[in-house]
Amino acid sequence: MPTCLGGGRKLSMMQNIWHPNEIRDLNLEQHAFELDNDGLTIVPPEKTGVSMEKIDRAIDAILARFTEVTGGCPISIKDGPMGELDFGEGRKSRFPGVADAVKQDQPKQTQTTLGQLIKLDRSLRDLAVNQVANALRDYIVGPEGNNAPQEQGELPPKARRLSNGGSAFVKWQGDYGYGPNLGLHCDQNGSAMPWGRNSLACNGMWTLTEYSKEGGALCYVPGSHKSMKVPSGNGEAHLAVPVEAPKGSLVVWHGGTWHGAFPKLTPGLRLNATIYYRHMMVMSQENLRVTMENEPWDDCENPDLMRELIGFDDRFPSLGNKRKYPKFIGSNVK
């Protein structure tokens, strides 16, 4: 396959202005090409610099957290949750066509998400600062882009920042999924359009188990980031392909890439650790929800508008872990 850097071939757009040496030094030229061309790349375990011991430690930390937040439900990679879980009323999915698991005539819910991973263990913090992952994120997010003068040969500051503390999507066998359109969406869909070449958001997902289509793998539409728009939710699923990868792989994709997931049809867990990044400009200059909380923000002609402008009722940025986790209601181990 062609490469985007070197070899006498036409250089990619970003190579002229952004960290080509880092990509070359880490032997990531092919992955940079795939990000440009397909909007997603899979880095095999042997190229990430992360040992299987560290991957297993991350797994143990996530499974221990699952047992903690569910109120004691045992769980393993082989068997999945070994107990009955009550998901409560839940909340309506943002994906069109997704079954409401609360209704009795719909499949039982078989997935939950754990947040704030980098609080849990050193292994997960190491994944967040992995050199290979960050080189690829730098490549598609691009530089800070400020107007400060640079010394000759000096590179502009890097612009990627953590958007959250990482999430683990814990998924087990069942018919419940993201609906007929596979939940296709893109991560920067809340950003103003039209988008450009640079990614405003970027995911780096570590496959903590083997990924296969039957095993509920991530899916994506190759090249969809070039459309610079969100999927319509009508009929794009046939374009999606599975992200199939061995345990310990790194999957990086552009914020404009359409992606979702297949339902998991096999026993055991499908587990990942997903580190979500953003361009540094995708934020406010001042955290007004904090700085104005105890100030007279409502002393104005239109308090309702001021509340909206400050963003007191916005979902993001979260000021703590407000996730609702399923609760362990009984063992199913015989």
Residues of each region from the PLM?
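Non-heme Fe(II)-dependent double-stranded beta-helix
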Residues: 2-37, 43-184
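Short hydrophobic-aromatic micro-motifs
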Residues: 42, 206, 251-253
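Short, well-ordered beta-to-alpha junction loops that form the rim of enzyme active sites
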Residues: 46, 165-167, 207, 223, ...
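A conserved hydrophobic position in a structured secondary element of the catalytic/binding core
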Residues: 119, 221, 253
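A structural signal for short, well-ordered beta-strand segments
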Residues: 166-168, 204-206, 273-277
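Catalytic core of non-heme Fe(II) oxygenases with the double-stranded beta-helix
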Residues: 173-244, 284-292
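Conserved double-stranded beta-helix
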Residues: 227-258, 262-334
